[in-house]
Amino acid sequence: TARLIKQHNPDARVVFIGPCAAKKLEAMRRSVRSEVDFVLTFEEMTGIFSAKHVDLENIDEDPAGVSDASTDGRNFAVAGGVAQAVVNVIKRDHPDHEVKVANAEGLKECRQLLKLATLGKYPGYLLEGMACPGGCVAGAGTMQAIKKSQTAVGLYAKKANHQFSSETEYIKELDKLVD
């Protein structure tokens, strides 16, 4: 997304805001550096809001475009969410196709899953690994308990108007840029 934004609007400033402190290192990679200008964690955003006396309780919940996010997209931050989104699209397009999934949470489990996959223990499986146990909602820059975040994400995902990201206006606009 950042690459497309920069291609079509080179003067745009792209800011990633999320719970993942590792995104800061990722944004410094040579392949990404010119596309993402800033990375802020939720913890940093809380500090900014506090310093600027921003009262989040009195801000409209739905800035333009946010409500168009899909159920699958909203669930990305929870362990198993990315793989489930892929499975949902495969099942939609190929209902008779079996999809085998293996998930890992935390670096130790991720290493173990990759080791087993390298040894051929998961042929044909879709593998998902989340560095933080519980998923991105448990990242170093999170501000609340993991279970509370997972529940909040689940409730937010259920409110989506679309199941699949391909149904959202935002993705339709991105598709036009790619074509």
Please report, for each region that a protein language model flagged, where it lies by residue:
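Iron-sulfur-associated redox domains of electron-transfer enzymes in respiratory
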Residues: 1-179
